[in-house]
Every structure is written in C-alpha cells, then in structure tokens.
C-alpha cells in the first residue's frame, strides 16, 4: 500500500506532509516553498497555472485568477456570506442550476469551487509524488471544524476530481493538536485550546490529550467557530479603507476597476503582514488608475494602530466562539494548560494579545501556524496506514443534527459536540389520519425554528399503513461516520419498510458532474504530459540546430556545396517543423538533420585526411540534452506550478 499523504487545503495557502521515518514532515513544492498559494489561473492560451505562478500574474489577469474559493465551497449563491464576497473579488461568482455558488472565467466558462480546489489538490499530490518517487492515490484532507455536511462532502468531491481517494476528512484544530501532542515526549495529561484563525475560516477547539493504557488519546471536548472569518476579511477591511481614502482624495471609486482591485488586494495583504513587525508602512501604487486628467497614483500611510482599529471588530468576533467552546466543554480558562495558535492571521500582535487576555496565558510560540495542520493530517494518514501506533483520535460533530417536526420545529437527534462516529434514533408519528407517507427533512444547526437551520436533504418514507394520527411509529436513525458525514434512515416499525440515504446535500455536485470533472482532470493531465513532451522535443531540436550551425561555421569551407546544401535544407525543414505542434514531425526532422550533420563531419574529416575535426553534429546537439532538460524543468515548474 502506498503512502497516505496529509493535505491542509487552506483558503490562502495549502501544504502537504507525509510520515517519514516515524515523523511527520512537510514537503517542499517545485518552487522550493513549504506552502503553496491556493490560487488557480486560466491564461489566454488555455494554460492552467496553480500556486505561485498563478499569484504572480494575478494583477494582469484578475478576472481569470481564482483565490479564496474555499469560502464558496458547499455554499448556495444566495448565502449572505457569498453575496458579501462578490463585492470583494475581481472574478465572477454566479448561481449554478442547483443554486450553488460557482465561478466563471472572462469567457463565461463556469466552474464549481470543487474544480478549482481540485487543481490545488493536484499540485499537492504531484509535490508528494515527486518527493516519494511513486504514485499517490490516498490522502487525509483537513477542513475547518465548523464546516457543515455540505462543505465536507464538497471537499471530498474535490479530492475525487484530483484523483485522490480521501481516506478521512479531519478537522483542522484537531490535526494541529495531533501535531503538537505527538511532539511532546511526556505522558502528562493536558487540556489544550487550538485557536485557528486562517485565511478564510475561524475555529476553536478544546481538546484533552490523555495517556490511556499506554495509548495517547486526543479527545475533542467542544468546538466552535465561524466559516466566514479569516485573513481575507482583515485584507478586505484594509482595501475598503484604501478605497475610501483614495475616493476622498481623487473622487474615483477603485472598486469598479478589477485591475486596481487586484493590485489593492496584493498591497493590503503586504501592508498587513509588514505591520506585524513594523509600526508604520506605506501603500504605494503608482498608475493605479487614470481619468481624463491623466494617470493617478495611490500613496497612503498606514499605521499599526489604524490597522488594529479597522479589524478590532473581527478580532472580537473570534473571542465569542472561544467563550462558547469553553462553556460547552464545562471548563474555565484556568483549566486550560496550553493555547496553540494556528493559521497565518494569528501572527498579528493584536490577535495574540486578545487571545492572551481571554485565556489568561501566553499562547505557545513553538508551533508553526502554517504547517501544524498538514503535519497532523499526515499523522492521521499514518494512523490509518498502520505506520503510527498507540494514537486514538476522538473528534466531534460541530453542529446539532435533526429533523423538522410539526409546526416547523427543529427536533435534534444528535447534539453538537457529540463524539463521532456515532448513531442515534428517535421515534416519530404521523400528523394526519390515514397518512400513508412522511417526508423526512434533515437539518443541521442550533436554531429552534427549522427554517433558520441548514437544510441537508429531504426524502420520503411511503407505504405506511393507514391509521389514526399519532399511532404509526416511524423510527428515524442518524449515523455519522468518522469523516463527520451523515447517513439517515427512516423505518415504519409495523411494516419494517425502510428508506436510507447518505446525505448528498440538495446543493453539491451530482455523480454525473463529478465523473465529468474527473474525466476533464484526467484529460488535462494527459494534455499536460503531451505539452511537456512537445516542449522537450523542441528544446532538443533547438540544441541540435545550434550545434549544427556552429559546425557549418567551423567546417563549412572544407566541404563541397552539395553537403552544405543538404544540411541547410535539413535545418530549414526542422525549423519549420518546430513552429508546429507535431512532436513526431519535430523528432523525424531532427533525425534527418542529425544524419546530414554526420555527413558534414565525415566530409570534413576526409578533407583533413581522416582526423575527426570534432564531435559530430548529432552529438553536438545531444551533448546539450541534459542542459536543455534542466532548462525545460525550470520552465515547466514556473508555468505549471
């Protein structure tokens, strides 16, 4: 069995790790970086860029560069959070036929967020394969603890599209706790809090790490969070401030200019990062836009104090879930041994200060906030693969699950913070006399009124024997697997008729759509391979042409015109072939030129009485093959990263 890799599929950055020699380690990508921007771009010539190369060209291609799509995954277009995001991104977000939020390129090609995420997962998969030297097919992927069922399903679908069998979906704070806890050599029992403020989501989990009969047990006591609170929101506050200041000064609203918006996004992110270590920075964007009077430049000073005032409300928003999680766990802040910070946004001093004030203790600084989650996912992969022993992980469901009952009431069957996997059943009855069928409406959330909770699915149980209302007994059973994904069944206890469903949210991709996307991804991988082979053939042909021209310059005067004529003709044919996309033609014309080059050297050698004047033309090209391959690798990595 191959390695089960661990992937932190982040809103802003992603990271991949494996178990290596009994320890989890992060793998560097083809650019030598330990994290990869979760950005995908589509260029005019149809090329797909992922990671750093996509980020580099974002300013010149804003409408076709997709970032932070994790905030859209598993969501409806009409969700308030999605509507809020539309105002802040330069690319198009639109409604799919089933009401889901999808994205579109400037030429109106529609894509699901799962497809975009799959491109990032493919990059992570390839990073692991390059390091291991073998094919990777299995992964543990992390999600925010507060992701609902639809968002978890959508993440699994993204894995399938990327060619991965997702063995487990694991919550990000739990993964970070695994990475932290396994690193501790002692067997001391401790209760810890993981405060995870990432690029797009916020989670807080209270976790007990205990030694039980020689086994390290990680039990999640409570979790809470906000799936639309993260570094992107901090960036947006800075962008709004810069836009308002520029509008006051110049009377121009930069929100209407996608190119300016993308430049502002980059500048806001840079300024925010700089202000974690500096007290003041300057946002300087020359030629940010223009009007009838000429080009306009943006130059605004931003202090740390101003940034903190802009995001103060967001930081406060992250503290309330901490209070709820502690309360749900039945603990006080004094019961907590350690506070672990995860996610890039926790590097902000004001965030660290707020966490310190609430929990009454300094958070740990020895956990890498960008890598801990991927390391934990790799450890869970090791547990599933049998490489890591004596570790037991007990996670929880973040939100209550239940059904809609008479009067629009939400009746909970499984309460939030229940350890998973778990099963629970409850018996219900009919609301009308002689009712022969019931509709089971499955929901997730905490509100008493069903309509305010997240609708997961509806299904019918028919064939109930006619009887007065209240007499038939319908048993509804909920079963949550280790991924936090729900299976529901309804059974008439008298007739034993049963209806079972694995919850596939009313939103989400159909099996046909997933199959199409998997096929598209496979086709693209084949296209990429062909493209690489074509570029390699062109590079080798180019080296051969260079070597042959050098040979003509050096030895042309020593041989007859007919020999030179054949070489020149072969050169012209190869140069023509190189302008096309036929790899076989380029290779065939290269062979003809090699043979013509050998004739040139043979003739020159004969003129000099049999002494070879130098390497043959074929070898002149071949001698550089390794160099050309290295050049190609760099080009490929830059363009395909």
Curated annotation (Swiss-Prot):
Start and end residues of each stretch annotated as Disordered: 604-625
Bias (Low complexity) ranges: 604-622
Keywords: ATP-binding, Chaperone, Nucleotide-binding, Phosphoprotein, Stress response
Molecular function (Gene Ontology), one example: ATP-dependent protein folding chaperone
CDD domains hit by this protein: ASKHA_NBD_HSP70_DnaK-like
Cited Pfam families: HSP70 (PF00012)
Modified residue annotations for Phosphothreonine: 201
Function: Acts as a chaperone.
Family, as annotated: Belongs to the heat shock protein 70 family.
Family annotation (NCBIfam families): PRK00290.1, PRK05183.1, prok_dnaK
Official protein name in the record: Chaperone protein DnaK
Organism from which the protein derives: Stenotrophomonas maltophilia (strain R551-3)
